[in-house]
């Protein structure tokens, strides 16, 4: 993808850096591509259970060159499109449920640490606390749905 195609999607350098980090979480063997197997591993770690057919569909949706895998350029295109989708409230609700393990309507530091750990992100207590602090508007040391939505919309 050309630089202008990326800039047409209006991704900031910071967003591209964040997506690079996310991409490397999916790209388990570090070969620069995401396979259906790698995608499945990450989705299962997030509590999803996609079928092989669903994984192929997800890859095919963004696999511009048709080689059966997603490279970083294709991943960026997918993320840029996702960010443009205004109808992502349902996705945000689903993401909140993934983090809110006990279903009490709040994401605690422990729940955040658990999900990040499943994603392969080993965070220190300080890093987890910092993430909570950044999103925690009312100062109760946990993230409610409204705070989560605000945080997701800022991305």
From Swiss-Prot:
Other noteworthy facts: This protein has four functional calcium-binding sites.
Q: Where in the cell is it found?
A: Cell projection, Cilium, Flagellum
Q: Which annotated residues bind Ca(2+) 3?
A: 100, 102, 104, 111
Which cellular component appears as one GO term in the record? myosin II complex
In terms of one coarse class, where is the protein primarily found?
other
Could you tell me the gene encoding this protein? CAM1
Known InterPro entries for this protein? CALM/Myosin/TropC-like, EF-hand-dom_pair, EF_Hand_1_Ca_BS, EF_hand_dom
SMART domains (UniProt xref): EFh
Which residues bind Ca(2+) 4 per the record?
A: 136, 138, 140, 142, 147
Please state every residue range assigned to the domain named EF-hand: 14-49, 50-85, 87-122, 123-155
Annotated family: Belongs to the calmodulin family.
Binding annotation for Ca(2+) 1: 27, 29, 31, 33, 38
Can you say what this protein is called?
Calmodulin, flagellar
Residues annotated to bind Ca(2+) 2: 63, 65, 67, 69, 74
Q: Function, please?
A: Calmodulin mediates the control of a large number of enzymes, ion channels and other proteins by Ca(2+). Among the enzymes to be stimulated by the calmodulin-Ca(2+) complex are a number of protein kinases and phosphatases.
Query: Which organism's genome codes for this protein?
Result: Naegleria gruberi
